[in-house]
Amino acid sequence: MAVDQESFVHLSRPLAPNVLGFGVSNAPLTVNIQPQAVFSIIDHAVRRDDRDTQSTRVIGALVGVRSEDGSEVEVRSTFAIPHTENEDQVEVDVEYQKNMLALTLKANPRETLLGWYTTSHELNSFSALIQNFFASPETGTFPHPAVHLTIGTEAGATIDTKTYISAPVAVSPERAAESCLFIEVPHKLLFTDAERGALGSVAAAADAESRSAPVVSDIENLAQALETVSDLLERVSGFVGEVLDEERDGNHALGQYLMNALSLAPKVSNLAIENDFNNHIQDVLMVSYLANTIRTQIELSQRLATAKLDEGKEGGEKKDGEGAEGDKKTDGQRGQRGQGGKRGGRSGGAGGRGGREQREPREPREAAE
């Protein structure tokens, strides 16, 4: 009688090569991804040139920060890496990757290389080769494991993301460089309330024919947010009602999540909530009024400063013209005075000569006897 036996693969930790002096944490790895990194990857996929490569995917490097124990990483930015790929081989521009990484780390010294991304969910021997390159001590993230992010960029499809780390497997030394086992790790997208609003505006432009959406004011944005919350509450209420009426099966995880959310609600009366909401609205209106007043004052001061500069330039030009004319008149008067003085002096000299009285001739004296 044959006995069914299951096959197992034994993996030894750490996931990176064990070198004296370097230790890797055994804690589970969590990957956090910023929205700008996803947009950068999508932009790279849209702008790829199909004439230079037969590959339908693009690759690039992931840059971000890592926690002290190495159990959590945050992908903040990415940059593309040129590569060519066919059925037989794959070529990566290593020099370009080194130069771009040096420039990126120079601009953001606190960040570091985390791994690489691709726009295909397929994992093959080329993926293992690139993964080992980014995890190597010379050019990679050693002693920490390299993160591999795959993202779907098909037109009209949902953007699906997955993250992996790798572990070495027992293979021959000749194929060690192109062999590894990809292990999927949890990940999540991080975005703030401001980024959520920006993403909502971008999503609203997707359904418009002009592919553009106006930027709404704070009051309109608040009204839209309240409408969204009201719709979500109606959906949750309908779901709970259907579960209570046994029209659909319940979900224990969702029920626990709703219980936790309700427990976080403050235990205050409706009147107090309404008063707080009205106070918040007044604060928002006051901030908006002050912002508009400051903006108007800045524009007015700029216009006044510009007008004063223009008046100063015109006054300076007039003074320069009057000064030049005055200098010319002064020089002319000095010339006339000089000529008159010379003439007067000559006349005076002639008058001096003519003013002498002529002596009468003396009679000869008789000789004394």
From Swiss-Prot:
Gene3D superfamilies the UniProt entry points to: Cytidine Deaminase, domain 2 (3.40.140.10)
UniProt region (Disordered), positions on chain: 309-369
Residue ranges constituting the MPN domain according to the UniProt record: 31-170
Domain of life: Eukaryota
Cellular component annotations (GO), alphabetically ordered: eukaryotic 43S preinitiation complex; eukaryotic 48S preinitiation complex; eukaryotic translation initiation factor 3 complex, eIF3e; eukaryotic translation initiation factor 3 complex, eIF3m
Keywords noted in UniProt: Cytoplasm, Initiation factor, Protein biosynthesis
GO molecular function, one term: translation initiation factor activity
Subcellular location: Cytoplasm
Ranges of biased composition (kind: Basic and acidic residues): 309-334, 354-369
Compositionally skewed regions (Gly residues) per UniProt: 335-353
GO biological process: formation of cytoplasmic translation initiation complex; translational initiation
Function: Component of the eukaryotic translation initiation factor 3 (eIF-3) complex, which is involved in protein synthesis of a specialized repertoire of mRNAs and, together with other initiation factors, stimulates binding of mRNA and methionyl-tRNAi to the 40S ribosome. The eIF-3 complex specifically targets and initiates translation of a subset of mRNAs involved in cell proliferation.
UniProt record similarity statement: Belongs to the eIF-3 subunit F family.
Subunit structure: Component of the eukaryotic translation initiation factor 3 (eIF-3) complex.
Protein name: Eukaryotic translation initiation factor 3 subunit F
Species of the source: Neurospora crassa (strain ATCC 24698 / 74-OR23-1A / CBS 708.71 / DSM 1257 / FGSC 987)
